[in-house]
UniProtKB/Swiss-Prot annotation:
Designated name of the protein: 3-deoxy-manno-octulosonate cytidylyltransferase 2
Functional description taken from the UniProt entry: Activates KDO (a required 8-carbon sugar) for incorporation into bacterial lipopolysaccharide in Gram-negative bacteria.
Enzyme Commission number(s) of this protein: 2.7.7.38
Organism of derivation: Burkholderia ambifaria (strain MC40-6)
Covalent S-S links between cysteines: none
Catalyzed reaction equations: 3-deoxy-alpha-D-manno-oct-2-ulosonate + CTP = CMP-3-deoxy-beta-D-manno-octulosonate + diphosphate
GO cellular-component term (any): cytosol
Gene: kdsB2
SUPFAM superfamilies: Nucleotide-diphospho-sugar transferases
Major localization listed first in the record, in broad terms: cytoplasm
Cell compartments where the protein resides: Cytoplasm
Length: 267
């Protein structure tokens, strides 16, 4: 089982909710012969071969697929509003110590780079006072600042999050930033990986959603609302987008068919 240098055990939870308005049965969508959740699990296992990995599910149809492949899973409440709450239930029911680290990897990201997962696990391990951790990369194209589906984050001089928003932050009062500003490290795009101590995860799950979280539909704002620091790891570029719609499925399948990838990072 993976542990940090200070002895803290590392668990990885992959939340997988069957119901999806835009793509019902999303975890089981076929991606070149394998259900998506199986591909996500394989990617995490390849990145962190010694980690304690649990898929947090809410439907017997997912359980059947995972059980047939010998993949560890935990059935969770169907009423959870977020993957954070689903991960918290797994940690609580499993009796993990408060000091253990829990990495939350989204179940709809079948192409998340193994190098990113490894780097993030290392980042969490190197953060002595780990509370909440996440990832961001340069926005790249300045036009993406205006895309509400792209979540932006502003950090302080320590690399801790000041705010997350679907709006353009920081706002440039004197007009649109130059195209080169997209790579200067000031305009950052959030990448939805999370790490916590179990104590922090449980505190987040127990807290009621805050007004900012409900307004922006961004669960990480709950941590900031509660005064919890969020340490942000920098990554050089955005990973391939996840799956939310049938069009996304077609895009990922096309990538898998074309096999335009580094041989060390098979899709």
């Amino acid at each position: 089982m993976t542990s940090f240098n200070d002895g803290r055990t590392v668990h990885v939870v992959i939340p997988a909710r069957y119901g999806s308005t835009r793509l019902p049965g999303k975890p089981l969508v076929d991606l070149e012969g394998e259900p998506m959740i199986v591909r996500v699990h394989a990617r995490v296992r390849r990145a962190l071969p010694e980690a304690d990995i649990v898929v947090a599910i809410d439907d017997a149809r997912i359980a059947e697929v995972l059980d047939a492949r010998g993949i560890r899973f935990a059935m969770t409440d169907t009423g959870h509003a977020s993957g954070t709450d689903r991960a918290a239930e797994v940690a609580r029911v499993s009796g993990w110590p408060d000091t253990d680290a829990v990495l939350n990897v989204q179940g709809d990201e079948p192409l998340v780079p193994t190098a990113l997962l490894q780097a993030f696990a290392g980042f969490c391990g190197a953060t002595a006072a780990l509370g909440v951790a996440t990832v961001a990369c340069p926005i790249g194209e300045v036009a993406l600042l205006d895309e509400p589906a792209i979540v932006k984050v502003v950090v302080d001089h320590r690399g801790r999050a000041l705010y997350f928003s679907r709006a353009a932050i920081p706002f440039c009062r004197d007009g649109r930033p130059a195209d080169s500003a997209g790579s200067n490290g000031l305009f950052l795009r959030h990448i939805g990986l999370y790490g916590y101590t179990n104590a922090t995860l449980q505190a987040l799950s127990r807290a009621a959603p805050c007004e900012l979280e409900q307004l922006e539909k961004l669960e990480q704002l709950r941590a900031l609302w509660l005064g919890m620091p969020i340490d942000v790891m920098r990554w050089p570029d955005a990973p391939p987008a996840g799956i939310d719609t049938p069009d996304d499925v077609a895009r990922v399948v096309s990538l898998l068919k074309r096999q335009t990838h580094d041989a060390t990072e098979p899709y």
